[in-house]
Amino acid sequence: MSRSINLDELRKKALESKKKNEEDESNDSDKEDGEISEDDPVIDQSNSVPPMKVPTFPEQIPQLPPFDRFPGTNANFFPFGAPFMLPPALMFGPNTVPFFPQTASSNKTFSKRKRSSENSFNNRNKAKSSETSDSSNTSQSFKENRALKDTATSRPLALSSDTSYQKSEKAKSEKSPFLSTSKNSDANYSKTTNQKEAEKAVSQLFEVGVRFNDFIAEGIEPSVVHTLFLKLGLDSSSASSQGSLTLSADKAARSAKLRKIDSNLSDTHILPGDNGTPTVLPERKNLISLPLLKQDDWLSSSKPFGSSTPNVVIEFDSDDDGDDFSNSKIEQSNLEKPPSNSENGLTMSRSDYLALLRNKEEEIRRMTKLILRLESNKKPYRSPTSAADMKLPSVPVAAVDNKSKTHLDTFEKVVDLSSKADFVEAGPSISSSGASSSAATTNSDTTEQILEAPWLRKTEQIAVVHEEHPAQIKKSEIDILNNLIEKEEGELTKYQTLVKSKTEILTQLYTRKKQLLEQQGKGNVACLPKESDLSMDSITEVSAQADENSSQILSSKTSNAPNGTTETDFEDKVPLVDYISPFYRFKSYRFNQQFVERVPLKYRSLTYSNKIEPMKVFCKYETTGGVCNDDHCEASHFRDIKMTDDEIIQDLSRYIEGNDEIEKESYKSGLDIVMKNTDENTDFVDVATRIVEYHNLWKSERMTIPVAKVSI
């Protein structure tokens, strides 16, 4: 919790210190230079704060309310040592003592020094020759000393030739460094150390919570406070949080770059240049407006779209001498010309223009129909052939395989589309003389495609389809079938060669296997396939029948196989292999009689080592053929699962058979006898074989087959 400061007590102490300094200054003025007054107190250098004195002028102390020992929280508290005084650099206003009420003593001017005391040092050190000088020299020196005194009074920081004045000023600054008169208001004083003290004091007060308005309320000049705030980079706004230091470097930079612009000049303007010199701009001249260009008649008489009379010109190409209508002259329609604007001088209404456009549209439609009629008479359409003539001969479904079916289906779809297409004749018979459009016919095989005019709204669309002769259709069908047959025959030949090569490879493999089995004395001829299975008789028969009647072969295959698959898909033969017991995966497989025959390393095999941890993976580096040298590898390694001969024998003898304790004891006793009969020089394999034989013998003697009670 922050400590509250009593401002009244601070004001009282500040007034006492001020009065004491005034007394010291008056004593110094009465003393001669170089003398020490008896009334001067001995200054204690250890304590910079002057001793407290009881005020002798009670009228200077304002009457304040009684002191409260437990005052409330002050919004503007000042945690500094008493008496606190801002440096004199801030005091440009009438109140020279900040944070204190203004009294009569604050405006009191100090008494001037005596002329004798000011010049006592100079008079004492004068030469004897100067004492006998005339009165004119004395009066002149008196005037010079008077001017020097006035200069020292107005500017205390200026250089003075009087050394006594310098000593007195130095003594006063040592006694009270915080107090000074308003004579320090000169601009040169801002370069002294007091300005740094002022900046330091303002920053400390700002950290405590004193803001711009608080300084103004105490009577400090606003411009001085504003300058200090800008120099320190503090925010001069009234509303700010406690203890926050808002830097306003941008404002300071902008204020430093401000330039004066003289706006009183009439024809000159100061522009922001490099040297800041004003630039005189030339006076503006009155521009003479140029006359507008005279528009042409055709520009002034232009009208919006649709307002002018439409003119349509249709030309006919009559260079065909073979036409029946080549010599006939087409009479142009005699349409009445609408009255133009230039003739009558009247503007036509919108309805008149629309009626005129409709008439022109009807005329264009009639002329287009006439053109179509002429074109149809020149190269008329033939009647479409019937769909019966377009039918293809029936192709047996079983004659081809699935791949051929897809090709045939695609071909039939194309033929159906061509046979079922609607051939549209040219529009209705249009003739001004009543002649029919289907009168003339030609033998031309191609027709010209007529483009549809966008203004034909009521005419039927004309579709032109290229026709083919039935003989051409049959010829194309035969060509397609021939291509399909050739393709399928090529694939069949490819499959036949592939089957032959695979058959030869299998024959060689089975022959090699038979030789190896005969070398081991365990030939198994029954596992080899028959020679009839490896012959190509069946394949050749199938190919011959496919050439003669492929439909019967495909029907027989598809009828016996499910889901449309052939029997060849289920005839893949798997070569026979020897029987392998599932018990070989157990560790007790070592007691099997075939263990030694089937396992190459026999009892030393790592596969059946009991040191293998089933819940621990093997090192990936060793499983790929490398050697793991990592001591911190947590995976299993092959070097860890190796077992010595003694460990293997102990592991084999650890298997105790028996369902109860009696059987287990009998098995142990028999195993001990077997181990005692072995010598130290006995081979490891022989010892392990004896243990396995004893285990199997004991199991065979006690193997019982439960037989149910059967009554005969």
From Swiss-Prot:
Region of interest (Disordered), ranges:
1-71, 107-195, 323-348, 428-447, 545-568
Indicate, by first and last residue, each region the UniProt record lists as having compositional bias (Low complexity): 130-141
* Top-level taxon of origin: Eukaryota
> Does the entry annotate any disulfide bonds, and if so which pairs?
none
Where are the compositionally biased (Acidic residues) regions?
23-42
Instruction: List localization entries.
Output: Nucleus
User: Which UniProt keywords are present, listed alphabetically?
Assistant: Coiled coil, Metal-binding, Nucleus, Zinc, Zinc-finger
- Name any GO cellular component annotation: nucleolar peripheral inclusion body
Q: What happens when the gene is disrupted?
A: Cold sensitive. Decreases degradation of mRNA containing a DSR (determinant of selective removal) region. Abnormal meiRNA nuclear dot formation in zygote. meiRNA dot formation in haploid cells.
Compositionally biased tracts (Polar residues) = 178-193, 327-348, 545-567
| Keyword Nucleus assigned | yes
C3H1-type zinc finger locations on the chain: 618-639
A molecular-function term among this protein's GO annotations:
protein-macromolecule adaptor activity
Give one GO biological process term. Answer: nuclear mRNA surveillance of spliceosomal pre-mRNA splicing
What's the main place this protein lives? Answer: nucleus
Q: Which residues form a coiled coil?
A: 5-32, 351-379, 471-501
Describe the protein's quaternary organization and the partners it interacts with: Interacts with mmi1, pla1 and rrp6.
According to its UniProt entry, the function of this protein is described as: Promotes the exosome-mediated degradation of mRNAs containing a DSR (determinant of selective removal) signal sequence from mitotic cells.
Q: What is this protein called?
A: NURS complex subunit red1
Query: Could you tell me the gene encoding this protein?
Result: red1
